[in-house]
């Protein structure tokens, strides 16, 4: 193996834990782990540790959980570890300039897109939402901007017509550790080749909201089908029927022109619930009424056919 780097790892969710696990499995020297404070979760609102904390404690690594890295005493926690590099994966806290400059080789980040496309909070979802043909991971040198640092390594993968944000998340959670380990080797060997991002190609991946996930029937069927996959498993595309939210898990596009107003139910049968859109027909295949499990359109029609009378409009 190349020169053994002293690594600080900073991350919080399962996506980050897969990267830390890969580093440890490949023999890297992780000298400390930073993760967000325990948060209330579940019905009992019991304080729960992050997946990163669970893994780090399992492996006997020192864990630090500052609320912020702005206070001097918290920055000193980083300095005292005398790291060569800090690896940041979905940490959730801003790293001040002073922290970015502490490790000898700086701080590097694993980002879930092919930068400079989809800088920001929701790159996986936005790549699906926009109909991109491929996505991937970028390992970049961090600076004070939002995903603006020089790119060190990229790995790409195709986006299929069946991918959801959930399946794409899993694909990138496999690619990310591969790219990270390669990048660390290059940093240790002095062979890394930073590449400046082309500002003319930048797009921003804004955070998702539950309101954005409400189905807008004026959009095209193709756009709506992509939204349904992009917002799965969160926040989930939804429509409202009789004041109740109904989540949509799966749909398909029927490329047939219709003069019906967007939102008009055209057919409701065992093939699905066909609804007119701004362009084309969206066929709803799997839905989930409030308080119920997801079910096929046919199963929902068996219990709630009055919701989907042809000619009625969904709003």
From Swiss-Prot:
It is an enzyme of class 2 (transferase). (6S)-5,6,7,8-tetrahydrofolate binds at residues 113-116. InterPro entries: Fmt, Formyl_trans_C, Formyl_trans_C_sf, Formyl_transf_N, Formyl_transf_N_sf, Formyl_transferase-like_C_sf, GART_AS, Met-tRNA-FMT_C. SUPFAM superfamilies: FMT C-terminal domain-like, Formyltransferase. GO terms for molecular function: methionyl-tRNA formyltransferase activity. Coiled coil: none annotated. One of its GO terms (cellular component) is cytosol. Keywords: Protein biosynthesis, Transferase. PROSITE patterns: GART. Pfam families: Formyl_trans_C (PF02911), Formyl_trans_N (PF00551). Its EC number is 2.1.2.9. It catalyses: L-methionyl-tRNA(fMet) + (6R)-10-formyltetrahydrofolate = N-formyl-L-methionyl-tRNA(fMet) + (6S)-5,6,7,8-tetrahydrofolate + H(+). Belongs to the Fmt family. Attaches a formyl group to the free amino group of methionyl-tRNA(fMet). The formyl group appears to play a dual role in the initiator identity of N-formylmethionyl-tRNA by promoting its recognition by IF2 and preventing the misappropriation of this tRNA by the elongation apparatus. NCBIfam families: fmt (TIGR00460). HAMAP family: Formyl_trans. This is Methionyl-tRNA formyltransferase. It comes from Escherichia coli O139:H28 (strain E24377A / ETEC).
């Amino acid at each position: 193996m190349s020169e053994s780097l002293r690594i600080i790892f900073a991350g919080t969710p399962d996506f980050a834990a897969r990267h830390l696990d890969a580093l440890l499995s490949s023999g890297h020297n992780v000298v400390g782990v930073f993760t967000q404070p325990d948060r209330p979760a579940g019905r009992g609102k019991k304080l729960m540790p992050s997946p990163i904390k669970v893994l780090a404690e399992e492996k006997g690594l020192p864990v630090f959980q500052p609320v912020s890295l702005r206070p001097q005493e918290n920055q000193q926690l980083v300095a005292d570890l005398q790291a060569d590099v800090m690896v940041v994966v979905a940490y959730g806290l801003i790293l001040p300039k002073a922290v970015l400059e502490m490790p000898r080789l700086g701080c590097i980040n694993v980002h879930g897109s092919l930068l400079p496309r989809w800088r920001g909070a929701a790159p996986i979802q936005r790549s699906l939402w926009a109909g991109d043909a491929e996505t991937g991971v970028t390992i970049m040198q961090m600076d004070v901007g939002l995903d603006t640092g020089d790119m060190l390594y990229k790995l790409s993968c195709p986006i299929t017509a069946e991918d959801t944000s959930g399946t794409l998340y899993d694909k990138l959670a496999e690619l990310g550790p591969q790219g990270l380990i390669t990048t660390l080797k290059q940093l240790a060997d002095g062979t890394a080749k930073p590449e400046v991002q082309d500002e003319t190609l930048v797009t921003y991946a804004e955070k998702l909201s539950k309101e954005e996930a409400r189905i807008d029937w004026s959009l095209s069927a193709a756009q709506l089908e992509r939204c349904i996959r992009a917002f799965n498993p969160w926040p989930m595309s939804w429509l409202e029927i009789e004041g109740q939210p109904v989540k949509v898990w799966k749909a398909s596009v029927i490329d047939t022109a219709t003069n019906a107003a967007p939102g008009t139910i055209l057919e409701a049968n065992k093939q699905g619930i066909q609804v007119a859109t701004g362009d084309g027909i969206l066929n709803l295949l799997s839905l989930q009424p409030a308080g119920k499990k997801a079910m096929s359109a046919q199963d929902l029609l068996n219990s709630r056919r009055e919701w989907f009378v042809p000619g009625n409009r969904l709003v």
